[in-house]
Amino acid sequence: MIKLARSAGFCMGVKRALDIVLELSRTGGGPIYTDGPLIHNPQIIELLERKGIRSLAGRGAPSRGLIVIRAHGVSPERREALRRIGLPLHDATCPDVAKVQAIVNKYARRGYEIAIIGDRGHAEVEGLLGYSRGLGRVISGPEDVEALDRGAKVCVVAQTTQDVRLFQKLAENISARVSECVVCDTICRSTKERQREAIALARSVDAMVVVGGRNSANTARLVTICGETGVTVFHVESEKDCDALSLRHVNRVGVTAGASTPHWVIERVVERLGAILSLERRGATRCARLIGQGLIRTHLYTALAAVCLYMAACLFQAVPAQAPLALGLGACIICVHLAHRIAGRGLLSHGEETLTQEYYHDHRKSLSFLAVASGGLSLWIAARVHNVLFICYLALIVMGLYYSFEEKIGKCVRWNGGWSLRTVPASKDIFVATAWMVAIVLGPRLVAHAPWTFRATAACGYVFGLVFIRSIFHDLRTIHDDTIVGKETIPTLMGIRGTELILGGAMVGMCALVLASAIPMGLKIALAVPFAYSATYFALSRRRFAAGGVWCDALADGQFIMAGMSALIWSAAGQG
């Protein structure tokens, strides 16, 4: 079992700094230079360099472009030096760091000595010293406290990513030594939450894996903090380091990550750990895992989920389900979703893709054949059933392929003036939900020449809502990756909290729709089961019980399986 800390990965300050430089890179204006590495993570630095975002370190003053102050902040002297270069200057200093700078400046003006509890030489600490008017000193341990004058008046602040317990201990020592002491707890909330969760997680598992750059101070602190609980701790920078870990006889593994660690690195580590742990299991278990991964990665499982949702929609509308329509629907889903997965590789490339995305690249020829064969089968079935269904499936496949390969098509055919469907806010979520709704509800109903009823409208809303919820679940998992590659998904626009409110509202609204529909009470209960499942999945995902990679997709599709199975059970029992 793998448990992933909810706080693992980017903090607010890092995400904000990334958002700023990525937005600047999208709007143009020449090369972008950051005053030192934007964040302490080699994978992110490499990705930014490929986007033309480079560090000023080791370079002369640039003659064109713009300069960005990184999240760690800078001293007033350094800020003035950057201004003298003469290029536009943008400030990506973390707001929490800026607050500490203001506190240091305030008390330095009043003549207080400034005791900064932090790491000597760290960029944030060096910037804070610049605001201390020569009255600052770095406190890294008890020996530094002894150097303070007993008659001094001291203001104590902390590096925002400092060890909470070390800060409290040193602050108490300083208060006991000097005549006047003002203690300002400036450790940021995300750091406190990350450390608190890491300690709790470490106490509940057999081993801890901390993911992050070797030169990241906050990652190193997490390693130390977890180690103090007595659990075995491993520090890895990527999934390549996992193969050397000794995990024999380990049943529960906790995973956390530093504030500069991107999502795809965490997911690759979780996937690799899952594969390593599975090797310790019996042969039958390993075989079942491989079969499950194959079904999910080829989207056969997604096709089965779509068929289950189709059967639930038929029961919702009181129309009979037809085997040819179910088979054609499943084949159409495989074609479109596989094409999207195959085309998706390259948005994050050169090592930033997850192991699942890497799988689609390594097997792209065989998977492309499966996608083409599935598309052909769906169109052949549709043509034999009805011309309307053929046109419906053909339109869905063409639109799906265009959306997936739009970037490559645009390079060959310059007819859209540079406009991209991918840049339309929430376009993927709406497109996928609409496509499933058309294939599952509208197409079969047009074929049957059935009159349009309120229950048909409700069925459209039911299918659209469930697929929309599934799509947002996926977007929440990939929010940081989507921000980096410029995808305008709901989470990148609304933030995590705003998206969670939308999810909650969608679930409540869908339950209300089911209850308001003119269908028997038994079937109402059956059709409401998927929302209970989604709520449970959402609650567990917030706690970050990590399934990892493809298994997360399988769990999200589980609501469709539940919809079909529960509706069929109620129908077979004579309750619908």
Predicted regions and their residues:
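Extended hydrophobic alpha-helices typical of membrane-associated regions
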Residues: 354, 422, 526-576
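The feature marks the mature, well-folded catalytic cores of soluble enzymes
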Residues: 1-257, 261-264, 270, 274-278
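The first (N-terminal) embedded transmembrane alpha-helix
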Residues: 293-316, 369-374, 432-440
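Transmembrane alpha-helical segments that form the membrane-embedded catalytic/substrate-channel core
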Residues: 331-346, 395-410, 438, 462-477, ...
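Glycine/small-residue-rich hydrophobic helix-like segments
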Residues: 195-239, 244, 250, 480, ...
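Intramembrane alpha-helical segments
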Residues: 358-447, 538-544
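Solvent-exposed interhelical
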Residues: 339-372, 465-508
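Helix-coil boundary and interhelical linker segments in multi-pass alpha-helical membrane proteins
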Residues: 309-328, 377-391, 441-461, 513-524, ...
